Amino acid sequence: LTEIHPQGEAFIASLAERLKAGRGGAAFFLDYGFPEGEYFHPQRHMGTVMCHQLHKAHADPLVAVGQKDITAHVNFTGVALAAQNAGLEVLGYTCQAWFLLNLGLAERMAEASLAERSQAQRLVNEHEMGELFKVIGLATSADWAAQGFDRGDRSHRL
């Protein structure tokens, strides 16, 4: 069982058209998901659909219909292939933690308040958002300097 994202490829193709119609450009997507090898792992034989209602998670979208948020993980390999098919370059793919650290989060937090440092820690902690969320960068050419992928690039896993 898996989720199907019929509009995903069309969205990427439309994005590529718009980026190429201008002076070029780049797009970065941050979401929770996996490269294809992990996305279709046997442990996820029932897909990745999750439902959230009143701060509780469960996997049955047919319970309490209309009263909760329903979400699914992104197949980042599918995103990368759609981008390449549309003429875009994949600048990089990594976890949110590496992306933010590569952009200088640690240096920015050195003089931040305790509350701000605590919030930043949640963004990069591997047991919270740091590893769960992934980032993929797409651009009209590989000439874009995508600093967020300097260390920890996982493009080879796509």
Predicted regions mapped to residue ranges:
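Long, Lys/Arg- and hydrophobic-enriched amphipathic alpha-helices
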Residues: 1-158
